[in-house]
A protein has these predicted regions:
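Conserved small/polar residues in nucleotide/adenosyl-binding loops
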Residues: 534-541
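His/Asp/Glu-rich metal-coordinating catalytic cores
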Residues: 2-73, 78-290, 309-323, 342-346
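Short, intrinsically disordered, charge-balanced linker/junction segments flanking boundaries
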Residues: 6-7, 520-533
């Protein structure tokens, strides 16, 4: 870790997550004696993180500077932007600011974690939270979830504009378009630094409007006039949920919901008025058998093939209430998150094996919620920042986004393709990376947060590849004599019934070692264990 010089007239901008990766979005802005945090997301574990449930950012820098933190400001309610909040609030109870739906979804998460004392604050677009040295403004955005916002941080050095996740959708489902007028006003005042998402920076053109999905769903529902329809999508894609409900209403189908997160989101979004479900249309999952196949639509989690999701359990015949049958139409209305392709493929194959028709990976049933190249260019032209730092994406995405900015005329020395933990110091005249802060992954395994480290992951990997052998032996504490055993328990190593000679040979080796230790009057458990371990290593050689 390089230490950076203390300069209270410089604004420090640091990412604790979201750079060189998908997910775990978290940005820290520090000015004088104040810190604000934008988003606090989680990500999913990769293939090497065996047994890990979720990954959250390392917040040791925030814990060290907790007295400076004025709040966490949420751009929208997706898991990669709010998923780490319960774990953070257990360590630092600081105010949370977000739009109504974002706060509603956060409340559900905090309730699951039994956190009752959170300081939650609902804001509206164009609201400004005034601090001593910064003012934080929420600005209406378009994304795949309602109430998405960008954030403008006003300082006496200039404005820092953080886009959050966005797309430029001129025909959004809820009719709420991006507040381009306010962005232009900020541009006239002068934007010092732009942080813009890079998720689709590799993709040419513009992202299609969410409304185009409606036509694709309409066509599939019409063709499946005699089939039961099951639609899997992201629970938090509320605009998509609304379109599925609208299509179901058009074809006189009832709607049931499966999957814990889907049930929670539908309940919150309906209660807050973001999801419009006609009276008597939503039915209990237990009641779907009371209706003919062509009278019901099931909306479910599992669009990413998550092993414990509702769709995955249906595919493996482990769902308690839904059994896939021949003739079912399964619509997977989502693109795979990088790394999930194998999981999704496994689920799709299982669904086909059960006789279902599966529609997936088609452009007319899913559109992205992230800006492509032409929208990113437009954002740069609207904001006209002095400095630029691409955010939210893997390295190649950040790099391509930086090249787009350079093509638009921004000097290369004003563009910063940073890594997580880099400290960008900036004022009205200059910007420079001056050091780093501690960052990394904190692995959540069940109730344990940060308990799983590299050594534990290494051991889990070895167990998964090589199996396990346990030697059970009872030894007298007084004189070191063997009282019982040795017995050998093996899992994932060899099939014992077909390897009796091998196991008998191993027992004989262990007996010889124990006999030698007994003759030498060795009683210490640690020494005995090492003798057996080194004997095993020697046998391997």
């Amino acid at each position: 870790m390089r230490l950076f010089r203390k300069n209270t007239n410089k604004i420090k901008v640091m990412a604790l997550g979201g750079l060189n990766e998908i997910g775990k979005n978290m940005t820290v802005i520090e000015y004088k004696d104040e810190i604000i945090v934008i988003d606090a997301g989680m990500s999913f574990p990769d293939d090497e993180m065996l047994g890990v449930d979720v990954v959250i950012p390392d917040i040791s820098y925030l814990i060290k500077n907790k007295d400076k933190i004025k709040g966490i400001f949420i751009t929208h309610g997706h898991e990669d932007h709010i998923g780490a909040l319960p774990y953070i609030l257990k360590k630092i109870n600081i105010p949370i600011y977000g739009a109504k739906l974002s706060i509603g979804l956060i409340q559900v998460k905090l309730k699951e974690h039994k956190i009752n004392n959170a300081k939650l604050n609902v804001v509206s677009p164009r609201d400004i939270i005034k601090l001593s040295h910064m003012e934080v403004e929420f600005i209406k955005n378009n994304h795949s979830i309602p109430d998405a916002c960008s954030i403008a941080v006003h300082t006496d050095q200039g404005i820092i504009y953080h886009t959050g996740d966005f797309k430029i959708d001129l025909t959004p489902i809820d009719g709420e378009v991006m507040d381009i007028h306010r962005i232009c006003e900020l541009s006239k005042k002068g934007v010092l630094l732009l942080l813009a998402e890079s998720t689709n920076a590799e993709q040419p053109g513009s992202t299609m409007s969410e409304k185009t999905v409606g036509a694709g769903l309409d066509d599939l529902f019409r063709k499946a006039s005699n089939s039961r329809i099951i639609v899997a999508t992201f629970a938090s894609n509320i605009h998509r949920l609304q379109q599925i409900i609208n299509t179901a209403e058009k074809f006189n189908r009832k709607v049931a919901v499966s999957g814990r997160s889907m049930v929670n989101v539908v309940a919150v979004a309906t209660e807050l008025g973001y999801l419009n479900i006609p009276d008597n249309m939503l039915i209990d999952l237990n009641d779907i058998s009371k209706y003919e196949d062509n009278e019901v639509v099931l909306i479910t989690t599992g669009s990413q093939g998550e092993p414990m999701s509702a769709l995955a359990r249906m595919a493996s015949a482990e769902h308690k209430k839904v059994e896939i049958k021949r003739g079912d139409l399964i619509i997977i209305s989502a693109h795979p998150i990088p790394g999930n392709e194998k999981l999704i493929s496994k689920v799709i194959n299982s669904l086909f094996e059960k006789g279902a028709e599966v529609v997936y990976d088609e452009s007319d049933i899913h559109v992205s919620g992230h800006a492509k190249q032409e929208e990113l260019k437009l954002m740069h032209r609207l904001v006209r920042p002095k400095f630029f730092m691409p955010a939210h994406g893997e390295y190649r995405m950040l790099k391509i986004h930086a090249e787009l900015a350079e093509e638009l005329g921004m000097p290369s020395q004003n563009i910063f393709v940073n890594k997580t933990g880099d400290v960008l110091e900036i004022d009205r005249n200059s910007a420079k990376v001056t050091g780093t802060i501690p960052t990394g992954n904190v692995l959540v395994d069940g109730l344990g947060v940060g308990d799983v480290g590299n050594i534990v992951l290494r051991d889990r990997k070895h167990l998964s590849e090589d199996g396990l052998m346990i030697v059970v032996v009872t030894i007298s504490k007084e004189d070191g004599r063997v009282l019982a055993g040795p017995d050998i328990i093996s899992r994932g190593f060899v099939y014992v019934r077909e390897s009796e000679d091998l196991m008998d040979g191993a027992k004989n080796v262990i007996k010889d070692v124990l006999r030698d230790c007994e003759d030498r009057n060795i009683k210490e458990w640690a020494y005995l264990k090492n003798c057996l371990l080194y004997t095993s290593d020697a046998a391997d050689e």
